[in-house]
């Protein structure tokens, strides 16, 4: 397995249109991101997956995205919970397994266990704060180690998983699944065992699902419960990524060396100052190509081989091009990614959609083989985007963009790559060279075609960055980049223009009827076969999206079903028509890759399924709303299909350039503006159409706080072979000019060329480049049309007012001084806003066609200025003017200025079309300036010293006519090559020499324009952000439309302003075809600000609306007000209700609608027909009281009153005199009549303000609340049922105490004694009731059989149970806020308002009486003393606080100033404590209403840490009519564990209930067995028909009354589950508490006895194991005589009680594997029969202070060992038995085999606790060479006894006394069983003699023979000699 390293980039901009450059989706695109299935351990050898095909391998590459929310880009709190439950089939002998779990750099480990099937059951918490996308890229790693091994190979196996996989699962959780472990380094090894785990991802506000832990019901079949089923077992694959070449890499190195070469006359090559190499990273592996030095177009021709398990846990193959640096770190050039989910398909993602949600599985099965494919890509170029290309020696502020963090702002080259996938894992090199044949094959994919691009700029508006002149540059790739000298010059930039004021707020560029045009040609591969399909699918998606929006709006507007059905039918019909339309074929197309064919097949199949599903839905669907989910799924699918990973054409990038610096940019995907000859549908969405583009700043830290500019631009892109098609798209007349400027200076009173200093006689617009008329040569294909002419530039001042009816001129008056001196006129007394010299006010005359609206120039004091209008600044050299201005004068200030303004308006007597005749002076065309470089003006002044005029020469195409001729303008205008050296030198200085001066000027002139009239109807806003300290804002809105803007009035102190204002833009000239404007009109942009008296107004948010265009005034369609979101920094900050209509205006304005009525001068209201239709409505307000009010300005709130505002009406309550004593209002009901819209969509919110009445008349607002949705408070006053009436809802306070309910204290003791006695007899307790209620019947004993009733266990808070309506049926609780909203936080909560509302319509006819009031006869507002009982049952999954991953929890109760800290009863070392505690205390309501239950972690030495807390509103429980103060049990018992505990009996509660419902009291009959209530008859028999009657039940009438009460929807006896929260992670669960609360008012007497919920204690048991014999044990040793033998003994223990290990004596010298023991093991243990778990309490370490309690399943482990005296004993084998699922043993050893223990073959098992004892043979096994072998058989008797039985039938360990039950005799071992070391005689007898008997006999005979022979030969010579001497003897 490949280790994983999270990618450094986890965030990118969702608007990145580069296709393949997207690192990771964000925002809306995140739902389009597919997430691969992550594994790190599946092996091809897993059973159940033979012969896998490619599509089976890829089947789960792509996860479903439907479960993934739209993820934000903001860091959030998350919690990952991992529970390690148990292991199974772990390899190894006598191992000690431990699991380490790593998530996001945090690692936790389990406790060390023993055996091959360990049970862990430990949970780990990982708290992280990161963006969702970063989190989903993190991985979860399980590593299983053998802790007993100190070798390096102690890792047994591992499994890796992506957090994103868990997040995509239902509930963001993987519940109790087995994961397969494998060896990460050995791809050929098999499974290394299994782990059962649960995994949860808990986000903000998420509730983790409840994990069921029923061991009996759990599926233990590993294969069927694998996390990834065996059918999709993963295989090793190899990714071959071929990297051929790159091009257009920008300069990355300093040009110092090149500059030195240049000085000495050598050739320089600055374009190749880069040393590129490519780094490929995937799944933690990084591989780099070779480095190629000094080459901007390198050719690597290398292949990278990546071996991985597939499908992989990693989504992106990341390619980063680096520039190698010798001394410093390598610089990133750019980063791009191959997203596996986009270049592969599983096949399983194709489903047949239908309205019932049941797809056709047969169809799905047949198509998976057709459409599934492994990752493949290219050969194709991948584009790189990042920071601007211009090289500087300074650190790049946008360097992060080059790593893929954020949207790249500039093209930085591209890389040609190809990816193929092979299903093998043969070991090969990581990187190798590509063969020459492959290089030749890829050549055909690089064929270039010429593309032409033309962009016409219609307007540039909403500019706020003013100052220097502005131009725009359009580039595609490197083509058109004015600062890049590697490409030939193109007319890719507009002329410089200065922004001018629009008279209201913004600035714009005054292009008027002459629109700048840029044109460029470029060369790219022809990928039209891909982009045509993309455009067709996008058009289809847009239509479906639009239809879905229309349908949703119709549903929201509650249109009739017939109308809804029409809209729905139109949507379905359009979709069917779209999907039936054939797609362009790939046949005969060039550059078609494998991926093209596969994606084409995928698209065709998907469209077919969507079409079939739509046809089926059309015929079968009945509910329109129910089909929306499925239709939106189709939309998601279409959006995925429209993505094109092989989009090699770079984006069109528009740059805004100011003072030769890049300021802001926009990226337009090329396919959106691309012309296609296939069909009109295949053309780009905006091809040849005017679109609105909002520019943005690179890496904008303010996140869109300010828009640099809003552009209206028309872009056309197409192949040069179809460039004539451009003629049909073009509007206006294109003009092409060469341009130069004639410069003169004033010297000695004469104008001439002397005195020009560095300026030339003829130059470009900047004056820095010398030009000559003769040096201009027209481009190829063009010729001069006429001679050079003077073309005077009209002053910008006269163009600033184009289209305006009124205008404000501004001039700044300047004064200067030395610090501390007197103010005197500055050298430049009058300037413009930029500090450039301007004429004095007396010299400025009113332009032609205008008249002054003011008497004279006025000082503007409505700014940050002093009372005379001055603002002050300090000039710091070398600057010549201050950079900032302030309103207060200081001694050190050197400059001051004030703004003079004068309004003028159109002269109605002058026609708009007539123009003033040019004076002779103007015809000369001179522009004047005081100094070179200053702003020019037309009228000469005495201070002027410099003048210039523009000469232009028009060009015409020589061989081509029409607008398309502009595409021939390639290259710069030719220049005279015989220029002097100065000219040559200047040409080398900057790239600007090539651009601007020498490129032709293209413009588009519109002879005809259309005058429009815009009306913007701004009605109201809601939910705006508070930006003032008084918790409100003072909002106003700037509304911008093209070059006009207007501002609404300011509404003070509100977050929900109602402007009700119509902004009228009387005449707006728009150039272009009206039908094109109607199709894509300019946007209306509304920017909302908070007005501040001091300081700059703060930005609240922005909204964009598209106006409704009316070209035919006869069609009277009124625009509809709609809510538009207000956005600020990608955050939703409210909504704006507005509409806009754009009407084409006739000259006299006769076709315009009449003006709306005025509310004030020049403030028009929204007219009837557009404004909402209103109705007189009554709002009744129940103002019950205020709670938990926090101090304001260091003083507590003591005398508050409440103000309610709605629809312009205001009512106020009386003042509460003393909030601490009486927090309720004296008079609780307010009434107001309001005109509210009938349509709920337009209803304004209700605003609640709390005002504190303080000394000296101060009345600060100390809290406010906005209630936006009023629909839930609407009611029909005539149909209100009596039981729902608010005044009848409070039962407890109005019922009088009755004496017979008082429980006498003296009766309680014998009752308790009887109860305890019964408990002993019945062996049931409250926990029996609890477990019976949760369904854990095995834990409740005889409880259910006895006929006892259960309670209700809610898995949530009681307030969240839907039928109890949040317990707010009497009154709701509204949080009060105060203060300014900071960037990250919401306004702080400062209190609560308890109250409610009733809203109903009033009759329009005043003669009709008003409906009856809703809030009447309310209960008293005085305090009530109550007894509160808090029952804490248990904690669930608490957040660990100790280093060991556990917690020592205890309970802390806080009620106002009363605190109960139960520190003494902490529960050590657990995350799931069983508290079983009850607390009782008294309180006064409503003053002490908030009951806070906290869980703390006990620490001995340090401060206790809070785990979490939950707060209960006791007042709501007390006042609710649902009886939540004390839940109703199912039966009425007067004794036993279910004894009645309420103060009132059921009959009394029923009587009160009847009185509250205004119905007759209940009537009993038949001795209380029959009851009549609410006109219904009830009998006791019908309720107790199937119930078992027991002795604890009360009298019949009480039982029957209780049964009737339980039918009335009251709260039953219950246990609720409350989530704990902490301030550390405010919205993430820190665990849960199961608990409930009872509240009893003391006025009704003492309550019944409390429940005893003390936890159960474990019972003592004894396991007796008698080891009789062993057989067929492995013979592990050889004796000295060579015999195979073993000295056998048996060792055993219960897991958790390892310190009580026991072993038999040794059966020495077993020669046949047989051992005889007759040995008894006695294992005492504590056991909970109800939970079937053993309780083990022990200290984890010797330094631990507390014992840790573990709950483990009861198991027995027995091991067979070989005894060695002089070395370590040898391990032979083991058997592990689960005492609950004990394998039934074999009766005879011959039938004892592996099959007994084979879980997969479902061997027979039984519970030893039920059978009590078992006897027979069990097999033992061991592991050898990775396989299990039979290590022997063991005969045993197993017996489980409880403590009582063990005392009655005693038995000793081994054969010790008392040796009974049964008596064990010494084993009848053979005589050969002994220890040779201690028995030498037996050794001689049984080892030596038995083995070597014949050897000994032979040796003796041989010895005798040898002795005989020795004697013979010894005596033979003497005998012979004697015979010779004495022969006769």
UniProtKB/Swiss-Prot annotation:
Basic residues composition bias: residue spans: 898-907
C2 domain boundaries: 62-179, 218-354, 996-1124, 1159-1283, 1408-1527, 1645-1793
Residue sites binding Ca(2+) 2 per the record: 267, 323, 325, 331
PROSITE patterns registered for this protein in UniProt: C2
Cofactor(s) for this UniProt protein: Ca(2+)
Acidic residues bias spans: 27-36
Annotated keywords: Calcium, Cell membrane, Cytoplasmic vesicle, Membrane, Metal-binding, Nucleus, Repeat, Signal-anchor, Transmembrane, Transmembrane helix
UniProt cross-references to Pfam families, sorted A to Z: C2, dsrm_Ferlin, FerA, FerB, FerI, Ferlin_C
TM ranges: 1894-1914
CDD domains in the record: C2B_Ferlin (cd04011), C2C_Ferlin (cd04018), C2D_Ferlin (cd04017), C2E_Ferlin (cd04037), C2F_Ferlin (cd08374)
Positions with a binding annotation for Ca(2+) 3: 1028, 1034, 1090, 1092
UniProt-annotated stretches for the region Disordered: 1-53, 898-918, 1845-1867
Entry binding sites for Ca(2+) 4: 1442, 1448, 1497, 1499
Disulphide linkage map: none
Residues given in the record as Ca(2+) 1 binding sites: 267, 275, 323, 325
Locations listed in the record: Cell membrane; Nucleus membrane; Cytoplasmic vesicle membrane
Cellular component aspect of the GO annotation: caveola; cytoplasmic vesicle membrane; nuclear membrane
Signal peptide residue numbers: none
GO biological process: plasma membrane repair
Residues engaged in binding Ca(2+) 5: 1764, 1767, 1770
GO molecular function, a single term: phospholipid binding
Topology of the protein relative to the lipid bilayer: Single-pass type II membrane protein
Family indicated by similarity: Belongs to the ferlin family.
PANTHER family: FER-1-LIKE, MYOFERLIN
Protein name: Myoferlin
Species annotation: Xenopus tropicalis
Designated gene of the protein: myof
């Amino acid at each position: 397995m490949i280790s994983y390293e999270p990618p450094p980039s986890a965030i990118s901009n969702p608007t990145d249109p580069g296709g393949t450059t997207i690192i990771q989706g964000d925002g809306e695109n995140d739902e389009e991101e597919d997430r691969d299935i992550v594994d790190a351990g599946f092996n091809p050898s897993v059973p159940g997956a033979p012969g896998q095909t490619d599509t089976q391998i890829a089947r789960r590459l792509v996860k479903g995205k439907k479960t993934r929310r739209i993820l934000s880009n903001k860091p959030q709190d998350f919690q990952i919970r991992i529970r390690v439950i148990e292991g199974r089939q772990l390899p190894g002998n006598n191992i000690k397994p431990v699991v380490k779990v790593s998530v996001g750099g945090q690692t936790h480990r389990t406790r060390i266990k023993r055996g091959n099937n360990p049970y862990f059951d430990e949970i780990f918490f990982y708290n992280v704060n990161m963006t969702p996308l970063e989190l989903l890229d993190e991985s979860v790693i399980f590593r299983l180690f053998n802790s007993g091994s100190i070798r390096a190979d102690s890792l047994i196996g591992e499994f890796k998983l992506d957090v994103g996989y868990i997040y995509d699962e239902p509930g963001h959780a993987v519940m109790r699944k087995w994961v397969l472990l494998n060896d990460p380094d050995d791809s050929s090894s098999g499974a290394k065992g299994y782990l059962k785990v649960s995994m949860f991802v808990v986000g903000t506000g998420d509730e983790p699902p409840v994990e069921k832990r029923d061991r009996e019901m759990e599926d233990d079949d590993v294969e069927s419960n694998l996390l990834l089923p065996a059918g999709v077992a993963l295989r090793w694959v190899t990714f071959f990524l071929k990297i051929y070449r790159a091009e257009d890499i920008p300069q990355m190195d300093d040009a110092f060396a090149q500059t030195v070469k240049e000085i000495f006359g050598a050739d320089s090559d600055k374009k190749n100052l880069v040393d590129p190499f490519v780094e490929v990273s995937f799944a933690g592996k990084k591989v780099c190509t070779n480095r190629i030095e000094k080459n901007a177009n390198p050719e690597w021709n290398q292949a990278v081989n990546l071996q991985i398990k597939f499908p992989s846990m990693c989504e992106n193959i990341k390619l980063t091009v680096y520039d190698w640096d010798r001394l410093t770190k390598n610089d990133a050039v750019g980063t791009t990614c191959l997203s596996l989910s986009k270049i592969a398909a599983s096949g399983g993602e194709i489903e047949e959609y239908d309205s019932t949600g049941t797809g056709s599985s047969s169809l799905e099965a047949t198509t998976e083989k057709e459409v599934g494919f492994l990752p493949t890509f290219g050969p194709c170029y991948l584009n790189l985007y990042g920071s601007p290309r211009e090289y500087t020696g300074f650190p790049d502020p946008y360097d992060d963009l080059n790593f893929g963090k954020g949207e790249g702002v500039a093209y930085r080259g591209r890389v040609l790559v190809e990816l193929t996938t092979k299903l093998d894992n043969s070991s090969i090199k990581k990187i190798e060279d590509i063969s020459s044949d492959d290089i030749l094959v890829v050549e055909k994919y690089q064929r270039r075609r010429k593309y032409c691009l033309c962009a016409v700029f219609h307007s540039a508006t909403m500019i706020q960055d003013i100052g220097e002149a502005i131009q725009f540059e359009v580039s595609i790739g490197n083509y058109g980049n004015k600062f890049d000298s590697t490409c030939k010059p193109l007319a890719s930039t507009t002329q410089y223009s200065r922004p001018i004021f629009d008279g209201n707020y913004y600035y714009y560029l005054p292009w008027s009827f002459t629109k700048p045009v840029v044109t460029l040609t470029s060369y790219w591969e022809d990928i039209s076969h891909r982009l045509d399909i993309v455009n067709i699918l996008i058009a289809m998606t847009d239509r479906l999206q639009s239809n879905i929006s229309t349908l949703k709006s119709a549903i929201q507007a509650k249109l009739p079903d017939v109308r809804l059905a029409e809209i729905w039918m139109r949507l379905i019909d359009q979709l069917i028509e779209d999907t039936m339309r054939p797609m362009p074929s790939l046949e005969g197309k060039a550059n078609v890759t494998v991926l093209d064919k596969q994606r084409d097949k995928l698209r065709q199949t998907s469209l077919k399924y969507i079409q079939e599903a739509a046809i089926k839905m059309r015929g079968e669907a009945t509910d329109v709303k129910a089909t929306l989910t499925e239709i939106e799924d189709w939309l998601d699918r279409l959006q995925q299909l429209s993505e094109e990973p092989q989009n090699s054409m770079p984006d069109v990038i528009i740059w805004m350039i100011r003072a030769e610096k890049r300021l802001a940019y926009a990226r337009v995907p090329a396919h959106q503006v691309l012309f296609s000859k296939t069909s009109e549908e295949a053309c780009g969405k905006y091809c040849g159409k005017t679109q609105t583009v909002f520019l943005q700043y690179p890496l904008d830290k303010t996140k869109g706080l300010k828009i640099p500019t809003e552009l209206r631009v028309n872009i056309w892109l197409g192949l040069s072979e179809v460039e004539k098609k451009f003629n049909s798209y073009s509007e206006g007349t294109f003009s092409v000019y060469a341009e130069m400027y004639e410069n003169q200076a004033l010297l000695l009173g004469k104008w001439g060329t002397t005195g020009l200093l560095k300026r030339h006689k003829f130059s470009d617009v900047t004056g820095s480049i010398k030009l000559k008329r003769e040096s201009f040569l027209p481009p190829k294909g063009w010729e001069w049309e006429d001679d050079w002419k003077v073309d005077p530039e009209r002053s910008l001042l006269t163009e600033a007012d184009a289209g305006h009816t009124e205008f404000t001129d501004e001039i700044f008056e300047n004064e200067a001084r030395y610090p501390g001196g007197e103010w005197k006129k500055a050298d430049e007394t009058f300037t413009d806003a930029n500090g450039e010299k301007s004429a004095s006010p007396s010299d400025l005359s009113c332009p032609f066609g205008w008249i002054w609206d003011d008497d004279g120039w006025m000082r503007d004091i409505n700014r940050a200025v002093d009372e005379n209008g001055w603002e002050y600044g300090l000039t710091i050299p070398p600057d010549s003017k201050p950079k900032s201005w302030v309103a207060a004068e200081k001694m050190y200030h050197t400059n001051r200025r004030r703004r003079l303004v004068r309004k003028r308006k159109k002269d109605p007597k002058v026609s708009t079309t007539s123009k003033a005749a040019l004076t002779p002076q103007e015809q000369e065309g001179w522009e004047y300036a005081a100094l070179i470089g200053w702003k020019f003006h037309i009228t000469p002044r005495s201070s002027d010293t410099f003048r210039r005029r523009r000469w232009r020469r028009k060009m015409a195409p020589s061989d081509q006519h029409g607008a398309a001729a502009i595409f021939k303008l390639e290259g710069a205008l030719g220049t005279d090559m015989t220029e002097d050296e100065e000219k040559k030198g200047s040409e080398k200085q900057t790239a600007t020499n090539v651009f601007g001066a020498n490129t032709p000027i293209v413009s588009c002139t519109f002879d005809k324009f259309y005058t429009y009239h815009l009306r913007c109807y701004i009605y109201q806003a809601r939910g705006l952000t508070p930006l003032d300290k008084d918790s409100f804002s003072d909002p106003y809105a700037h509304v911008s439309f093209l070059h006009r803007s207007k501002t609404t009035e300011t509404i003070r102190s509100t977050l929900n302003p109602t402007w009700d204002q119509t902004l009228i833009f009387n005449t707006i000239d728009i150039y272009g075809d009206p039908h094109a404007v109607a199709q894509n009109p300019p946007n209306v942009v509304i920017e909302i600000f908070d007005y501040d008296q001091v300081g700059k107004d703060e930005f609240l948010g922005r909204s964009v609306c598209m106006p409704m265009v009316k070209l035919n005034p006869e069609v009277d369609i009124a625009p509809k007000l709609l809510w538009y979101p207000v956005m600020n920094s990608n955050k939703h900050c409210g909504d704006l209700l507005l509409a806009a209509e754009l009407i084409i205006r006739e000259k006299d304005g006769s076709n315009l609608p009449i003006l709306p009525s005025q509310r004030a001068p020049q403030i028009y209201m929204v007219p009837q027909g557009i404004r909402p239709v209103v109705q007189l409505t009554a709002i009744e307000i129940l103002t019950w009281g205020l709670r938990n009010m926090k101090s304001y300005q260091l003083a507590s709130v003591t005398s508050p009153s409440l103000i309610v505002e709605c629809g312009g009406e205001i009512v106020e309550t009386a003042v509460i005199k003393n909030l601490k004593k009486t927090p309720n209002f004296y008079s609780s009901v307010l009434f107001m009549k309001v005109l509210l819209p009938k349509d709920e969509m337009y209803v304004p919110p209700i605003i609640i303000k709390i005002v504190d009445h303080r000394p000296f008349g101060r009345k600060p607002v100390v809290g406010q609340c906005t209630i936006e949705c009023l629909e839930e408070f609407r009611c029909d006053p005539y149909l209100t049922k009596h039981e729902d009436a608010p005044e009848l809802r409070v039962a407890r306070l109005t019922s009088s105490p009755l004496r017979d309910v008082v429980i006498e204290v003296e009766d309680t003791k014998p009752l308790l004694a009887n109860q305890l006695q019964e408990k002993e007899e019945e062996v049931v307790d409250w926990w029996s009731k609890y477990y019976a209620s949760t369904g854990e019947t095995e834990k409740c004993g005889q409880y259910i059989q006895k006929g006892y009733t259960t309670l209700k266990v809610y898995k949530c808070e009681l307030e969240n149970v839907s039928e109890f309506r949040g317990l707010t049926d009497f009154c709701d609780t509204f949080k009060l806020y105060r203060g300014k909203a900071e960037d990250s936080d919401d306004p702080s909560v400062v209190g609560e308002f308890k109250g409610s509302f009733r809203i109903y319509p009033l009759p329009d006819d005043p003669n009709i009486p008003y409906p009856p009031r809703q809030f009447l006869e309310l209960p008293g507002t005085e305090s009530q003393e109550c007894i509160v009982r808090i029952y804490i049952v248990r904690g669930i999954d608490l957040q660990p606080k100790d280093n060991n991953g556990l917690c020592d929890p205890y309970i802390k109760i806080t009620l106002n100033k009363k605190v109960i800290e139960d520190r003494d009863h902490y529960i050590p070392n657990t995350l799931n404590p069983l508290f079983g505690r009850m607390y009782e205390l008294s309180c006064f309501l409503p003053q002490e209403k908030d009951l806070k239950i906290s869980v703390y972690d006990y620490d001995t030495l340090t401060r206790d840490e809070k785990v979490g807390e939950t707060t209960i509103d006791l007042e709501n429980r007390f006042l609710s009519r649902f009886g939540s103060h004390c839940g109703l049990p199912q039966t009425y018992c007067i004794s036993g564990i279910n004894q009645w505990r309420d103060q009132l009996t059921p009959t009394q509660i029923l009587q009160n209930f009847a009185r509250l419902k205004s119905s007759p009291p209940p009537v009993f009959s038949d001795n209380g067995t029959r009851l009549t209530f609410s006109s219904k008859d009830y009998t006791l028999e019908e309720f107790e028909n199937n119930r078992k009657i027991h002795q604890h039940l009360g009298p019949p009438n009480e039982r029957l009354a209780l049964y009737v009460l339980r039918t009335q929807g009251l709260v039953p006896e219950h246990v609720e589950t409350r989530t704990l929260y902490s301030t550390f992670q405010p919205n993430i669960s820190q665990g849960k508490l199961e608990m409930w609360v009872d509240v009893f008012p003391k006025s009704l007497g003492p309550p019944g006895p409390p429940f005893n919920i003390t936890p159960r204690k474990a019972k003592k048991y004894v396991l007796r194991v008698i080891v009789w014999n062993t057989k067929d044990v492995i013979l592990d040793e050889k004796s000295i005589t060579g015999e195979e033998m073993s000295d056998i003994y048996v060792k055993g223990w219960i897991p958790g009680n390892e310190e009580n290990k026991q072993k038999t004596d040794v059966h020495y010298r077993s020669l046949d594997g047989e051992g005889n023991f007759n040995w008894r093991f006695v294992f005492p243990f504590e056991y909970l029969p109800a939970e079937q778990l053993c309780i083990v309490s022990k200290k984890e370490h010797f330094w631990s202070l507390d014992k840790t309690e573990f709950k483990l399943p009861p198991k027995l482990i027995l091991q067979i060992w070989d005894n060695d005296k002089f070395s370590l004993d040898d391990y032979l084998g083991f058997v592990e038995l689960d005492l609950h699922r004990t394998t039934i043993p074999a009766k005879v050893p011959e039938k004892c085999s592996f099959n007994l223990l084979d879980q997969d073959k479902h061997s027979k098992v039984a519970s030893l606790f039920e059978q009590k004892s078992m006897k027979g043979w069990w097999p033992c096994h061991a592991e050898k060479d990775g396989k299990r072998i039979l290590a022997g058989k063991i005969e045993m008797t197993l017996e489980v006894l409880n403590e009582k039985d063990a005392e009655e039938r005693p038995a000793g360990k081994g054969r010790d006394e008392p040796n009974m039950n049964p008596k064990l005799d010494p084993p009848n071992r053979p005589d050969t069983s002994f220890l040779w070391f201690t028995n030498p005689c037996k050794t001689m007898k049984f080892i030596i003699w038995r083995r070597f008997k014949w050897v000994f006999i032979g040796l003796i005979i041989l010895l005798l023979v040898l002795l005989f022979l020795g004697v013979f030969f010894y005596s033979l010579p003497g005998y012979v000699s004697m015979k010779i001497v004495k022969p006769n003897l």
